[in-house]
Each structure stands twice: as structure tokens, then as C-alpha cells.
Design a protein with these regions (language model features):
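Histidine/acidic-residue-rich catalytic or RNA/ligand-binding cores of hydrolases
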Residues: 179-183, 207-218, 368
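Conserved active-site carboxylates
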Residues: 1-15, 23, 27-39, 65, ...
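Residue-level marker for buried hydrophobic side chains located in beta-strands
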Residues: 7, 40, 66, 197-199, ...
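Active-site metal-binding loops of divalent metal-dependent hydrolases
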Residues: 11, 44, 68-70, 203, ...
Length: 980
């Protein structure tokens, strides 16, 4: 590196949340443009997206330097918000690992305080593998110097001790008096301790426009740094940097040497390569393959003995297993398959049912025999090469579906099995979207105007109007509101949050903290600072444990019906009664619960599992070209009879990805591995790979064709074009088979166990619409749904098989506390004589140290939950007097009418001229209620309340007059008219 260039090492991207609007690629591109040879990223407190940054630097021929701007504290306990800044840069790969671990430590609950922090003791123990630089005006050196104002070598012990641990002292070029003063102090300190100076820019924006966007982003969040207008934090060229120092008046020789020290520092850093090898789990060392083989033998024999598999096809099973084990050996996947088998076996042993299969793994015989899936490829014709092949370049993964309420148990199993530092969740970046950007800009413009003492009309109301106009006419809206849209493009897509990706968890044979770092999120979980795409690039194994509501509905139905969760071999997949009933209602019918999907299924009239897969594929974008013809049961004709025969189960239509593999494998003679690779190449528009395989494809096709070569080649090319045209959207048959099984199982249970099924469905309803559909279905089946009642209802819906009654659960009521049912159950157990007793017990009874809140109690009263103690008006009156007196220690006579004084007197332990005290409040309220005239019930109000909170009406327990009430209800809005 030469002296007329430099290295930017103190640099922030949008990953330094709310402190930048610049993406890292902009910086790298600019560095390359300026001929700079290295770059470091020093985000606040962590190394977010560092793998992505490293990969982009490598691709652009620039050295990536691993770094962080960490926070230091003088004491971890008691917590003090000092949070000094210091730059750490990795000198070599050991330094990379050290910084990674330090970032993880800093995020621990005992360290974190507003920011992830390290103690000074931890800082002082950092090894020589890490370059330590003093950073900006938030450095401990500046803070202590500002208060002490020591000159030259006259330093106190504090400054001396910390200064000696820095490899460089950072001077900055900003046109700010305090910065200039601090620079001169650092120059003196450098002379005293022979610590070299280095120039840091504290860059936060690629250019002035992005700097303005950064300011607006901060204004929108009420962040306002004092005096920052004097700091130019944009990316500088070498000449621009020198010009800035000229304005400071520093000795030219000093700042030029400090600038060149960035080059010397960067040259001292050893480059390193990312480890992109497959990181499959290793369970038993070199014995993994042997243990997997023994597991397969054991489970195969168990299935054969139980009659689950057809032993007449033993050779077919053996050939498939042999082929798959060979592939797993070549790609190093044996330990992974073994772990999945052991994990899912553990799930079943612990009453955690798993969906039949999710994704392409449904094509693996090893997966079926080892209980990873419950889809037998020999029975269902699923394809292994779609799941894995020996030339696979991407890490394999297996997704599983579990009940949402058991998902955390499976994740914990993985963590326990691999260890905390070998497991972590994945980073998810939340970005500023269009509507949010408009809101933030309008908010920032108001803040900016208020700061300047100006009027501003960018209200929230105007922001809403702008968003609506923007959706209708983007170009016109941009012209109408130029101030807003000046910033819009520069803020759109900016990272504004970092959280846990919902997809899954990483488990690795290598220590994730050392190799990649991590941070502790608000839920106490370890999250890698790496995006999903880079997880695949570095070939870490991701375990997707997805919570599927229908698996939970099936599980809960089976529990209520007292039957085991059905396995695929136990189900009659050709039950005509189930197929006929399936198209009578969409309720609980997995993948066909929407009106459109169900209507399509009804029109098709399925009679076999493949029909469900076909309809499911057809309603997706790829099905647009053949949807109507398929639903009309037309047969499609392809370029040849061979292809027609291949696609006969699909009525001749190209529907599934596996159809492409079958064409290339069965007709064109490619291996399963080559066939899947060609399919992937077509899907990714990698036409060069297709062209290289084309001679083999055409040769194989022509060899199996009885037509002249020119005709056969034309047929093959025509079908390849059909494949290419639909490749972006084709559905997976392996995946669809498992999911159609779930749909059929729901239909089967709904038909044979309707009471239990609808109870489970209601307990798992996610929306008011689901509850309404479930309630309607129950009534169509002749079941009675009773409103929640004191002494009968639980948190969930419960069913009574003898009376065919379903009691609504309190947990399904919006705004109801989740502890309400438990509290009511405990109160009921104390046998309260009346509603007054209930109210006073509510003060004493707690669950998780919490009482039932006022809102939940109001809802329970409003829906008639306590109807055994009186009608709605009576209970509200009791509640009124309870609220008036229950918490009062004394009652002043001046606040009471004479009749009330007469009732209070016998219930008071003490009486003075002005007040009563030591009052028996329960008895007082009962006495008050006893002398008040009785009110007729307000049935109209009760009906309104039930429609609002329950979605239906149940007033059966109420003693009402002969008036008849007619209720006309459309969802929650109800028109109630009284007919005399």
C-alpha cells in the first residue's frame, strides 16, 4: 500500500441500528473505486452480517478486516451507563474468534445495560491477536481527559493504565473544537508512551445524501446528537481526508504518518478464508454410519414384524437403502440422518407427534424406515434424488411439523443434545418498508421544524393520506410531496431491527460462538449475527421445527377421542365415506380452508390422495395454464406417448418438480443425481448447464423412442421448453404427498370423530372467523355450544360426549387473561355462596402471583358467566357497590344518605361522629343489595355482549319475560330488534 491512499477501519453500516442508512456494499464499491486495498466494519457492539460482508469483500478483491466498536464499562455491577467506545480489529483468525466471543460475552444479561458491554478487566485481558484502537470522543481516554484536562505526560494512573493497552491512538479529522483539542492530547500521549497514531474517520454514511437520510431516521426516533453538525461522517478519499486535517491545523507530518498507519495496520492483518465445508452433525465419531445402519436394520425388522411394510418387496427396500446410504456417505450426511432419526424417535416417545413429512425428504426410504418421515417411497412413489444426490453442492436440511405448543420442546432437545455454544437461532433483519418510511419521514420533518421553531403540516393524518395516494399513483405523489420523497429512496429498506428468524435453529459440530459470534436476544436465546442466505453459503445445518396448527388439531382430536395419533399404515386412504364428506365443508381441512381452495377441491371431487396434491398445485401460480382443464378432468397430450404415459397420474399435465426428474431419468437415461441437477439448472435459468447436458438428454430420449431421430429430438426439445416455462413455480410431489396426508387425516377424524374434532378445531382457532366457522359447523352437526359458565368452563373448549355439548373456553375470548380460567376454578372450589363472595375471593386468589384484572371480570359478567348468581343488571349492581366500598378502610358519613348510614352502622366495628371503620364489607354489600328493588334483566344488552365476545348467543339459563328477541347477526355487527 502506498502513502497516497489509506484504509477506512472505523466504519458503520445500517447494522449499527439507527446510526446509518448505508448498506455495506456501497462502502466496498467505493473503496474499490478509490483503489483502497482493505476495509473494516466496526458496528456498535456486535459483528452483524460479517460473513456477508466478508464474502462481498472477497468477491471484489479487497481485504476484509474483522472488527467491532465495542462498549466498555468500569463496573458490571451495580450497573452504570458509562459505555465507553473502543475499536477492536482482528489481526488473524485467532483474533476473529476472540472478537466473536467477546461480542457474545458483551451481550450476556450480566453485561448488557442499554448496550452490550465488556468490563475494563476483560478489555485489559484481550490478547495480541486483536488490534486495540482508542476510537472517538466516546473513548475512555477522552472522557477522563475531559474532566482532568491533563497536559503532556502529566497523566493520572487511570489514563496511563488504559492507554498502554492500545495499539493505536485514533485521531479524527472533524471540524470540531473538542475533537481538535482531543487530537492534540492524543499526540502528546503518543509521544509519552510511544504509541503510534492512526486516523479514524468514524464513517456513518457513503455520501452527503445518505447522511441527511441518517439524520431524518434519527429524528423520526427522537434521537438528536448535540453538535453533530460539525462532524462530517461521510466516506472520504485520501485527498479529502488530508484537506480536513489541514483545517484543523495539525502538523502535516504527524497526520500524514497517522494516515499511512492505516495501511501499515491493514498490512499487519492476516487474511483468512471462510470455512464452507458441510457441517453435518457428528454423533458417534467414525461410528455414525455403522450406528445408522444398525438403526435401519432394527426399525426395518420392527416394521416388517408389525406388518407395516410388505416383505415381498424386501429387495426393493434393500436396493433403495443401499443407494441412499452410498449417497449419504459421499456427502457426509450419515450423522445428520442419524440425528434426525434419534430426535424424531424421542419426539414420539415424549408424545410429540410429527407431521407425515415436510419437503423433499419424503422421497427418502432411509428417512421412512428410520422414522424421520411417515411417507414410504415404495408405496407413494416419491423420489430420493429430489432430496439428495451425490453431486449436491448445498447443505441438506429436513423440516418437520409439530404442534405449535410443543415446538419449544423440540428446540430444547436440539440445544441439550449439541450444547449451548453449538446451537443458535438465525438473524433476521427488520427493514423500513414503504409505509413505515413515509411515517418516519413525516415524523422527522415535524421534529426538524420544531427544532427550528417553524410550523410543519406533516401530521400523522397527512402521512396516512400520502400513503394512500402513493399506492394509487406513485409518480404524481412524488411530485406533490417532494420533501417527503427526497428522503424516501435513501431510507427505504434500511435495517431498523435485529431479531430471531422464525425459520429454525442451527446446530453444528463446531463452536458457533468462536467461529461466528452470537448475541443474546430479549428471550434469552442465542442468535447468530448471520443472515439466512449466508447460513446456506457456509453450509451450516438448519433445523426447521415448524409449528403446524393442523398437527395440533389432529393431536388434540386424538386425545379427546382417546385414540393414538394415526400413522400412515393405519389409515384407509381409500375410504369413500371420507372422500364424500371431505367436500361438504372446509372446516379444519388442511390446505383447503380458504373459500377459493375449497371450491376448487369441491369441483374436482377427489377420490385419492394424489388428487389433493394436484388441486393444491393447480391453485398456485404455476397452475394457471392448465387449472381449468385439470378441474374439468380433461387429459393433456404431450409431444409423445412416452411423456403422456409418464404423466398419466396428472391427467397428462406437468405439475411437479419430480415429473421433470422422472422424465430426465426414466426416459432420457440420466442418473437421479444428474436429473435433479439439470432440473435445478433449468429452474435457476442456468442455460449453459442445460446446454452441456443436452446431448446426453437427447441421446437418451432418442434411444428410447421408436421415431426417427429428428422427430424424437424435436419432441424432447419441445418438452424441455415446457419444463423451462413452468420451472419457477412447479410444486414438489414429495412435499405435497405428506401435506395431502395431513389434509386427509383431518377429513377422516372430522368424519368419524366430529365432536372431538370441532372441539380441537375451536381450541386451535386463530381468528374470530375460525371460531365462527367452527361454531357453525358444530351446530350443523347438532352439537350444542354453551357459553362459558362458572364451575363448568376451563381455559379451553371441552366437550361432553353424552350430551353432545361443547363448553366454550375462556382462553378463546378476546382480551381475557390467560389465568382467568384457573382463577375461576380455584374460586369455585371454595364454594362461594353468592356473587359478593366471588368478588372478594377475586382479591385473594392468585395464579402466578397475579389476580384477575378488571377487564376480564367485566367480560365475564357481561356474557352471563355468573348467571347462577343473578341476572346481568343484578350482577352489575353488586359490582358497583363492591367497587364503591370493597377497598375503603373508612366510610365518611357526609358521603352517605340516611338509609345507607342505617345499613352501614350494624356492619361497622367502630363509629365516630364523622365516619365508620372496621367494616364487615362483604356483609354490608349483601345488606345493601337485599333492600334494593329487583331489576328486570337487560336481555338485549346480554345478547349484544355475547355476540361481541363469543360470536354467538346463549341465554338459556336466564329467567326472562315473555318478550321475544330476534337477533339478526352479520359477524360481530348485530341489529337487535324487539318484537312484542
Amino acid at each position: 500500500m502506498t502513502k497516497n491512499n489509506y484504509v477506512v477501519y472505523h466504519l458503520h453500516t445500517e447494522q449499527s441500528l439507527l446510526d446509518s442508512c448505508t448498506n455495506y456494499k456501497d462502502y466496498v464499491d467505493r473503496a474499490v473505486e478509490l483503489g483502497q486495498k482493505a476495509i473494516a466494519f466496526t458496528e456498535h457492539g456486535n459483528v452483524f452480517t460479517w460473513v456477508e460482508k466478508k464474502m462481498y469483500c472477497d468477491a471484489n478483491g479487497i481485504k476484509y478486516i474483522h472488527g467491532v466498536e465495542c462498549y466498555l464499562t468500569e463496573q458490571l455491577e451495580p450497573k452504570v451507563r458509562d459505555n465507553y467506545h473502543t475499536i477492536l480489529l482482528a489481526k488473524n483468525y485467532e483474533g476473529v474468534k476472540e472478537i466473536n466471543r467477546l461480542c457474545y460475552i458483551a451481550s450476556q444479561p450480566d453485561h448488557f445495560y442499554y448496550r452490550p458491554r465488556l468490563s475494563f478487566d476483560e478489555f485489559l485481558n484481550i490478547s495480541d491477536n486483536v488490534i486495540k484502537i482508542s476510537a472517538c470522543l466516546s473513548s475512555p481516554l477522552y472522557t477522563w481527559h475531559k474532566y482532568a484536562r491533563y497536559e503532556d505526560g502529566n497523566l493520572d494512573d487511570k489514563i496511563r493504565d488504559i492507554a498502554r493497552h492500545y495499539n493505536y491512538l485514533e485521531i479524527q479529522p472533524h471540524d470540531d473544537a473538542e475533537q481538535e483539542r482531543y487530537n492534540r492530547f492524543l499526540i502528546a500521549l503518543s509521544d509519552s508512551f510511544n504509541i503510534p497514531l492512526i486516523v479514524g474517520t468514524d464513517t456513518h454514511s457513503i455520501n452527503q445524501y445518505k447522511a441527511e437520510c441518517r439524520t431524518m431516521l434519527q429524528y423520526s426516533k427522537n434521537i438528536d446528537f448535540a453538535n453533530e453538525d460539525t462532524f462530517d461522517l461521510t466516506y472520504k478519499s485520501y485527498d479529502e481526508l488530508c484537506d480536513m486535517f489541514e483545517k484543523q491545523g495539525l502538523d502535516k507530518e504527524i497526520y500524514l504518518e497517522a494516515i499511512n498507519n492505516t495501511n501499515i495496520m491493514a498490512e499487519s492483518v492476516e487474511d483468512f478464508e471462510l470455512d464452507t465445508s458441510f457441517k453435518y452433525p457428528i454423533l458417534y465419531g467414525e461410528q455414525d454410519e455403522q450406528v445408522l445402519l444398525e438403526t435401519l436394520r432394527k426399525k426395518y425388522n420392527e416394521k416388517a414384524k408389525a406388518g407395516i411394510i410388505n416383505t415381498a418387496k424386501a429387495k426393493k427396500y434393500g436396493d433403495k437403502v443401499k443407494e441412499e446410504l452410498s449417497v449419504f456417505h459421499k456427502v457426509g450426511m450419515s450423522g445428520f440422518m442419524l440425528f434426525m432419526s434419534e430426535m424424531i424417535t424421542w419426539c414420539w416417545e415424549n408424545n410429540i407427534p410429527i407431521g407425515y413429512c415436510r419437503g423433499s425428504v419424503g422421497g427418502s426410504e432411509v428417512a421412512y424406515l428410520s422414522d424421520i418421515t411417515d411417507v414410504d417411497p415404495v408405496v407413494w412413489g416419491t423420489m430420493f434424488s429430489r432430496f439428495c444426490n451425490e453431486h449436491r453442492k448445498e447443505i441438506g436440511d429436513i423440516d418437520i411439523d409439530v404442534s405449535p405448543d410443543q415446538r419449544a420442546l423440540v428446540y430444547q432437545y436440539i440445544i441439550d443434545r449439541f450444547g449451548v455454544e453449538n446451537t443458535a437461532y438465525i438473524l433476521a433483519n427488520g427493514t423500513l418498508q414503504s409505509k413505515g418510511a413515509i411515517d418516519d419521514i413525516c415524523r422527522a420533518l415535524r421534529h426538524k421544524a420544531e427544532k427550528a421553531g417553524e410550523d410543519c403540516n406533516y401530521t400523522l393524518k397527512l402521512a396516512d393520506e400520502i400513503k394512500k395516494e402513493f399506492e394509487q399513483d406513485e409518480e404524481a405523489t412524488r411530485k406533490k410531496y417532494p420533501k417527503v420523497f427526497y428522503y424516501y429512496d435513501g431510507m427505504l429498506g434500511c435495517v431498523i431491527s435485529q431479531s430471531q428468524h422464525p425459520a429454525g435453529i442451527i446446530a453444528s459440530p463446531i463452536n458457533l460462538i468462536d467461529n461466528y459470534s452470537g448475541f443474546i436476544n430479549a428471550d434469552g436465546q442465542v442468535v447468530l449475527p448471520i443472515n439466512m442466505e449466508e447460513i446456506h453459503e457456509i453450509n451450516l445445518v438448519k433445523y426447521d421445527i415448524l409449528g403446524l396448527q393442523n398437527v395440533q388439531i389432529i393431536r388434540d382430536t386424538c386425545r379427546l377421542a382417546n385414540i393414538p395419533y394415526p400413522k400412515s399404515n393405519e389409515i384407509n386412504w381409500n375410504d369413500e365415506k371420507v372422500w364424500a364428506d371431505m367436500i361438504t365443508s372446509p372446516v379444519g381441512l388442511f390446505q383447503f380452508e380458504s373459500d377459493y381452495a375449497f371450491k376448487c377441491l369441491q369441483n374436482f371431487k377427489p377420490t385419492m390422495l394424489n388428487h389433493m396434491s394436484l388441486v393444491n398445485a393447480a391453485i398456485r401460480p404455476s397452475g394457471e395454464s392448465y387449472r381449468e382443464r385439470l378441474f374439468n378432468h380433461e387429459t393433456n397430450h404431450n409431444p409423445s406417448e412416452q411423456i403422456d404415459d409418464l404423466l398419466r397420474d396428472n391427467n397428462g399435465f406437468l405439475v411437479f418438480q419430480e415429473d421433470v426428474i422422472k422424465f430426465l431419468q426414466d426416459i432420457c437415461g440420466l442418473s437421479g443425481s444428474d436429473a435433479d441437477n439439470v432440473r435445478r439448472a433449468i429452474g435457476r435459468k442456468q442455460m449453459d448447464r442445460l446446454q452441456s447436458a443436452l446431448p446426453q438428454i437427447l441421446e437418451g430420449y432418442c434411444n428410447k423412442s421408436d421415431k426417427p431421430r429428428n422427430v424424437a429430438e424435436k419432441e424432447a426439445k419441445t418438452f424441455l421448453q415446457i419444463i423451462e416455462d413452468s420451472s419457477n413455480y412447479m410444486f414438489g410431489y414429495n412435499h405435497s404427498t405428506g401435506y395431502s396426508m395431513i389434509g386427509y387425516t383431518c377429513a377422516m377424524l372430522r368424519y368419524y370423530y366430529p365432536l372431538e374434532f370441532v372441539t380441537a378445531f375451536l381450541n386451535n382457532a386463530r381468528t374470530d372467523e375460525d371460531i365462527a366457522k367452527g361454531t357453525k359447523f358444530a351446530k350443523e352437526k347438532g352439537f350444542i355450544i354453551k357459553a362459558p359458565k362458572f364451575g363448568h368452563s376451563q381455559n379451553i373448549y371441552v366437550c361432553d360426549k353424552e350430551t353432545k355439548t361443547i363448553y366454550k373456553g375462556l382462553g378463546s375470548i378476546k382480551s381475557m387473561q390467560n389465568i382467568a380460567a384457573d382463577i375461576m376454578e380455584r374460586i369455585y372450589a371454595q364454594s362461594p355462596k353468592d356473587f359478593v363472595d366471588v368478588l372478594f375471593l377475586c382479591e385473594d386468589v392468585r395464579v402466578d402471583d397475579k389476580r384477575i384484572n378488571s377487564k376480564s371480570m367485566d367480560i365475564l359478567i357481561d356474557i352471563g358467566f355468573f348467571s347462577e348468581y343473578g341476572n346481568l343488571n343484578t350482577l352489575k349492581r353488586i359490582r358497583h357497590w363492591y367497587d364503591k366500598f370493597a377497598k375503603r378502610k373508612t366510610i365518611k358519613k357526609q358521603d352517605c344518605d340516611d338509609w345507607l348510614i342505617d345499613i352501614i352502622r350494624p356492619n361497622a366495628g367502630k363509629e365516630t361522629e364523622k365516619q365508620f371503620s372496621d367494616i364487615n364489607k362483604p356483609q354490608l354489600i349483601k345488606d345493601i343489595i337485599s333492600i334494593l328493588p329487583k331489576h328486570k334483566d337487560n336481555l338485549q344488552l346480554l345478547i349484544k355482549n355475547q355476540i361481541e365476545h363469543l360470536g354467538y348467543v346463549d341465554v338459556g339459563d336466564y329467567d326472562v319475560d315473555m318478550d321475544i328477541y330476534v337477533v339478526q347477526s352479520a359477524h360481530k355487527d348485530a341489529i337487535i330488534s324487539r318484537v312484542l
